[in-house]
Swiss-Prot record:
CDD domains: ALDH_F6_MMSDH. GO terms for molecular function: malonate-semialdehyde dehydrogenase (acetylating) activity; methylmalonate-semialdehyde dehydrogenase (acylating, NAD) activity. Pathway: Polyol metabolism; myo-inositol degradation into acetyl-CoA; acetyl-CoA from myo-inositol: step 7/7. SUPFAM superfamilies: ALDH-like. PANTHER family: MALONATE-SEMIALDEHYDE DEHYDROGENASE (PTHR43866:SF4). The keyword Transcription does not apply. Catalyzes the oxidation of malonate semialdehyde (MSA) and methylmalonate semialdehyde (MMSA) into acetyl-CoA and propanoyl-CoA, respectively. Is involved in a myo-inositol catabolic pathway. Bicarbonate, and not CO2, is the end-product of the enzymatic reaction. It comes from Listeria monocytogenes serotype 4a (strain HCC23). The active site is at C284 (nucleophile). Homotetramer. This is Malonate-semialdehyde dehydrogenase. Keywords: NAD, Oxidoreductase. One of its GO terms (biological process) is inositol catabolic process.
C-alpha cells in the first residue's frame, strides 16, 4: 500500500495533509482496484476549516454580485472543457456507465449555470408607498458559512446543487464529500480555483462521523445541506436544528411507477428498465415499485422480464455496458439479503440478479420480484440497488392508494395517454416530483428537488428559488422620506 496516493483536505486554498492516522481505501467497484486512500479527518480539521471560511466570508460577501457571477461563469466554462475527464472519474470511482456519468456532468454544469444568474437571483423587492411618505424594500444577504454533506451516488451533480449557488450568493462553503467517491471533488476544486475563486471561500474536508458532527455543531456554520439516507438525514436535521442552524436534508425514497392499460408498451418498458436499473438503482429517483393494471400486466411483465435479462452488465468504462456495479461489497451482500428476504416473505423472483457471472467487482444484475404486497420488507425499505418490485392492481385508484402507503414521497411516475387519469394522478399522489410518460422525473436546476414525507426534512428544498431562499437572509427596510419643502 506504500505506493497508494493519500488524498489531502483542501483548506484556505491549499491541499493540506490530514492529521489523522485513519485512512480508507477508495475502490473501483467494477474491479476491486484501490484507487487511492481518503483521510477520515478529525474534528479539529473541520473546526480549522470553519475559521478559515468565516474569514473568507467577510471579504467574499462584499464582492459585487456581478463579479461573483463572473467567477461562476468561468467555472462553468472550465467544466465544459473537462467534461470527458470528469465523466471518466465518476465512472472510475462510482461505477455507473460512461453515458450516465456524462449526463451527471451535464446536470452539474447546468446547476453552475443557474448559480451564475446570481445578480438576478439576489434581487429583492420594494414598494414605493406603504403609507404617506413611507416606502419599504426587501434586501437579500448571504447567511455566512455553509456546510454540505454529499453522497456517493452523484459525486458531481449533488455537490453542484450546493456549493455553486451558496458561493454565488456570497457565502463561503465547507463540503464533506462521500469518502467513497472523493476523486471527482479533487478535480472540481482545481477547476474552481482556476476560475478565480479566492482562497478560503470553498473548503473540502474528507471524513466520517467527526466531520459530520463538526458541521452540525460548530457555531460558525450557519446552514447545512445534506443528501443521503433517511437515518442519517434524520440525525442531521435534528442535530443541526438543535444547534440553531438552517437545515435541508434530502433523504430516502421508494418511488412508484403506475402503468395503465393504454400505456405505450414498448416505450414504457424502455423507461422502466432505465429508471429501475440505471446507475445500479443507486439513486433517490430510481423506480423501485411498478404497479400495473391487471389487463395489461401479463403482456407488460413478459416484455419487462425479457428486457431485464438482456441488460449488459460490466465495467462502466466498457462499450455497451448499461449496468455497472453497486458501490461496495457490503452493498452487494445487503442487496442479496433483501432479495432473499422478499422470496422468504412470498414474492416471486422472476428475474434473479444475484449471480452475474463476473469474477471481480461488486455486481448485482437486474432483479424483478412479482406478487409483492405492501407488508413485505422489500416494498417498505429503500434497497438502493437494481431491484424492482411489481404489484398488480385493478385500477388507477388502487395504484395511487398503494403508492401513498409508503413513508417516502420523493417521486412517482405514470404511463398513460388519458388526460383525466394524469390529472387524477397529479392531484392524488403523495410525492414531490412527478413524471408523465417518463421514468425519472428529476427536475432541472431552476425547479426545486421537492421530496415529501420521510424523503425530506426541512422547509426549503434544494435547487430553484428554494435554494436562493435557503442560502440568503432577508432584511426589510422601512423608511420615511418627507417631501416637505418640495411641494409645488
Amino acid at each position: 500500500m506504500a505506493d497508494v496516493r493519500k488524498l489531502k483536505n483542501y483548506i484556505d486554498g491549499e491541499w493540506v495533509e490530514s492529521k489523522t492516522d485513519k485512512y480508507e481505501d477508495v475502490i473501483n467497484p467494477a474491479t476491486g482496484e484501490v484507487l487511492c486512500q481518503v483521510p477520515i479527518s478529525t474534528r479539529a480539521e473541520l473546526d480549522q476549516a470553519a475559521v478559515i471560511a468565516e474569514q473568507a466570508f467577510e471579504k467574499w460577501s462584499q464582492v459585487a454580485v456581478p463579479r461573483r457571477a463572473r467567477v461562476l461563469f468561468s467555472f462553468q466554462q472550465l467544466l465544459i472543457q473537462h467534461k470527458e475527464e470528469l465523466a471518466r472519474l465518476i465512472t472510475l470511482e462510482n461505477g455507473k456507465n460512461l453515458s450516465e456519468a456524462r449526463g451527471e456532468v451535464q446536470r452539474g454544469i447546468e446547476n453552475v449555470e443557474f448559480a451564475a444568474g446570481a445578480p438576478t437571483l439576489m434581487m429583492g423587492d420594494s414598494l414605493a408607498s406603504i403609507a404617506t411618505d413611507v416606502e419599504a424594500a426587501n434586501y437579500r444577504y448571504p447567511v455566512g458559512v455553509v456546510g454540505g454533506i454529499a453522497p456517493f451516488n452523484f459525486p458531481m451533480m449533488v455537490p453542484c446543487w450546493m456549493f455553486p449557488m451558496a458561493i454565488a450568493l456570497g457565502n463561503s462553503f465547507i463540503l464533506k464529500p462521500s469518502e467513497r467517491t472523493p476523486l471527482l471533488m479533487e478535480k472540481l476544486v482545481e477547476l474552481f480555483s482556476e476560475a478565480g475563486l479566492p482562497k478560503g471561500v470553498f473548503n473540502v474536508v474528507y471524513g466520517a462521523h467527526d466531520v459530520v458532527n463538526g458541521i452540525l455543531e460548530n457555531e460558525i456554520i450557519k446552514a447545512v445541506s445534506f443528501v443521503g439516507s433517511k437515518p442519517v438525514g434524520e440525525y442531521v436535521y435534528k442535530t443541526g436544528s438543535a444547534n440553531l442552524k438552517r437545515v435541508q436534508a434530502l433523504t430516502g425514497a421508494k418511488n412508484h411507477t403506475i402503468v395503465l392499460n393504454d400505456a405505450d408498451l414498448e416505450d414504457t418498458v424502455t423507461n422502466v428498465i432505465s429508471a429501475a436499473f440505471g446507475s445500479a438503482g443507486e439513486r433517490c429517483m430510481a423506480c423501485a415499485v411498478v404497479t400495473v393494471e391487471e389487463d395489461i400486466a401479463d403482456e407488460f411483465l413478459e416484455a419487462l422480464r425479457t428486457a431485464a435479462k438482456n441488460v449488459k452488465i460490466g465495467n462502466g468504462l466498457d462499450d455497451g455496458v448499461f449496468l455497472g456495479p453497486v458501490i461496495r461489497e457490503e452493498n452487494q451482500k445487503r442487496t442479496i439479503a433483501y432479495i432473499e428476504k422478499g422470496v422468504e416473505e412470498g414474492a416471486k423472483l422472476t428475474v434473479d440478479g444475484r449471480e452475474t457471472g463476473l469474477s471481480e467487482g461488486h455486481f448485482v444484475g437486474p432483479t424483478i420480484l412479482e406478487d409483492v404486497t405492501t407488508d413485505m420488507t422489500i416494498w417498505k425499505d429503500e434497497i438502493f440497488a437494481p431491484v424492482l418490485s411489481v404489484i398488480r392492481v385493478k385500477n388507477l385508484q388502487e395504484a395511487v392508494r398503494v403508492a401513498n402507503l409508503s413513508e417516502f414521497a420523493n417521486g412517482a411516475c405514470i404511463f398513460t395517454n388519458n388526460a383525466k387519469a394524469i390529472r387524477y394522478f397529479r392531484e392524488k399522489i403523495d410525492a414531490g416530483m412527478l413524471g408523465v410518460n417518463l421514468g425519472v422525473p428529476a427536475p432541472m436546476a431552476f425547479f426545486p428537488f421537492s421530496g415529501w414525507k420521510s424523503s425530506f426534512y426541512g422547509t426549503l428544498h434544494a435547487n430553484g428559488k428554494d435554494s436562493v431562499d435557503f442560502y440568503t437572509h432577508k432584511k426589510v427596510v422601512t423608511a420615511r422620506y418627507s417631501l416637505k419643502g418640495y411641494e409645488e
